[in-house]
Amino acid sequence: MKCSNTSGRYALLDELRGLDLVSMMLYHGCWDLVNLFGIQADWYYGLPGHLWQQSICWVFILLSGFCVQLGHHTLRRGAQVFGAGALVTAVTLLFMPEDRVVFGVLTLLGSAMLLTGLLEKPLRRIPPAAGFAISAVLFALTRNVSAGYLGFGSLRLWLPQTLYANYVTAYFGFYPWWFYSTDYFALLPWLFLFWAGYFLYGIVGRQRMEPLRCSVCPPLGWLGRHSLLLYLLHQPVIYGVLLLSLIHISEPTRP
């Protein structure tokens, strides 16, 4: 493959992030149609919609963890992303409290970056293969903490209900019955998926990543490089476009 990338970046990683961003925009567009405009789409809340949603968040979180060691100033970047998550929470609480976002994906990613930056020295001492395996196992074990237990399948360790108390416990993954958020990604289990991506980078290594410098679709790369800003802007833009489109469709045609 001939590389047209001269920036020194791993272009394919940007493009994968951009592709995932497009998928997320389409998913959120469907969310608007179903929840705000009343369009009937049973598949959206069925298995197809769930798998679509999970594919988006898995790629985002794994890729974010993978790319941590490619950049610098992890703590500063984490603070920026966490602040963006706080902004999303504030805006939704103010303007659309019934569809509020509390502890959404940006809050998770910012928290994961901050924790990774603080724990960078001990994390780097862990062999990448062992770190990846441990992270994957812990992700599987904590996948259902929101449902009240550790484990999977028939192997379940039920947790005390006193853990599920308030917003602080919800941040960690133990949300009480009254907690509500349209986008919820707690530290447990998702921090371990982030760290799985972090250790996956160590397994792959920079030498084997050279083919990732080759660009396949530059427009997707541009989206990937500006993913945080586009994430913050995409929902109001999509809502406005859908609203104008539906108004135009519903207008009676003039003779």
Describe these PLM feature segments.
Residues 1-250:
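Alpha-helical transmembrane segments and their immediate juxtamembrane cytosolic regions
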Residues 251-255:
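Short "domain-exit" segments at the C-terminal end of structured domains
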